[in-house]
């Protein structure tokens, strides 16, 4: 779980063919930690998560799972697909990444409260041991999360 501190999004370094350069991406994140951050997140919007394939994400997850800075590394999914989110979270959980940065699907404009809650609820039901860091990025997701919207479902652990 996250402790009090300064956390940042880590960028994704791409090769000339636009595939993920796993080693350079990890090296960048390692430098963030060495320069004083308490942790960093892979596969958020800064990490261009929407453009990184599931297989590339899985490769990075397996590599950082044994990295010496492992305890400072956290993951987002960066997926619009509910099923792909669940699959990637389950894969990350196999490597004990149980705190996941998760934003509502950013594909459709005008998400409803009900739709967003169902999205989170289905992920929690499929992956009950994870802790979710709710990623509230209105300009990307087209949705405004507020404390009022999430307090009761969070308390009941339905979201």
Annotate each predicted stretch with a short phrase.
Residues 148-159:
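Single conserved hydrophobic/aromatic residue that forms the stacking wall/gate
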Residues 2-143:
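Active-site beta->alpha loop and helix N-cap motifs at the rims of alpha/beta catalytic domains
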